[in-house]
């Protein structure tokens, strides 16, 4: 009988020990699970914050890119319009009445004929230039009108073609033209 009591005491002690170990294990497991949940919440929160930040950054990049594209398109359209105005001006010069062409050439020659020994002009203006100047006619040039004067030793050329005058005025006035067209 003494042995049964000892065995029973050992079994009860073992059961108590098992219960204690199990309770500690459950507590530790619960602690680990809670800690894991907290880490998961923090990680999820960090991930959401990062995703939101990345989304905001991407949104800003898309807006900036779109704004740049709009500016590029606007500038290209403005350039196209300015080029159209320039080309229309060239066409207006080409289609000037003969009397106006003569008047302009005479004005250029009156002011600058003394600076040259030879004159060049477009094929269309050749006869008119020969008529208006005593300078030697040196040949044709590719232009919409006007003349080029050259000195005796051919070291200096003065370009009074309508092409170069228009281009010079256009470049000097580009800002003003743009302001007039686009406010």
Curated annotation (Swiss-Prot):
Optimum pH is 5.2 for ATP hydrolysis. Disulfide bonds: none annotated. Keywords: ATP synthesis, Cell membrane, Hydrogen ion transport, Ion transport, Membrane, Transport. It is found in: Cell membrane. It is a peripheral membrane protein. It comes from the Archaea. InterPro entries: ATPase_V1_Esu (IPR002842). GO terms for cellular component: plasma membrane; proton-transporting two-sector ATPase complex, catalytic domain. Component of the A-type ATP synthase that produces ATP from ADP in the presence of a proton gradient across the membrane. This organism has both a Na(+)-translocating F1F0 ATP synthase and this H(+)-translocating A1A0 ATP synthase. Belongs to the V-ATPase E subunit family. This is A-type ATP synthase subunit E. It comes from Methanosarcina mazei (strain ATCC BAA-159 / DSM 3647 / Goe1 / Go1 / JCM 11833 / OCM 88) (Methanosarcina frisia).
């Amino acid at each position: 009988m003494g042995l049964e009591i000892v065995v029973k005491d050992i079994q009860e002690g073992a059961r108590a020990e098992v219960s204690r170990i199990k309770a500690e294990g459950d507590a530790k497991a619960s602690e680990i699970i809670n800690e894991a949940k907290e880490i998961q919440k923090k990680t999820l929160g960090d991930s959401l914050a990062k995703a939101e930040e990345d989304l905001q950054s991407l949104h800003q990049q898309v807006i900036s890119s779109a704004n740049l594209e709009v500016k590029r398109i606007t500038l290209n359209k403005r350039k196209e319009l300015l080029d159209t105005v320039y080309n229309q001006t060239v066409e207006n010069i080409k289609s000037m009445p003969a009397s106006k062409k003569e008047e302009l050439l005479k004005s250029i020659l009156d002011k600058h004929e003394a600076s040259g020994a030879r004159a060049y002009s477009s094929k269309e203006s050749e006869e008119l230039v020969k008529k208006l100047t005593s300078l030697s006619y040196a040949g044709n040039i590719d232009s919409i009108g006007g003349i080029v004067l050259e000195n005796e030793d051919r070291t200096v050329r003065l370009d009074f073609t309508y092409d170069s005058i228009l281009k010079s005025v256009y470049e000097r006035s580009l800002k003003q033209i743009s302001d007039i067209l686009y406010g």
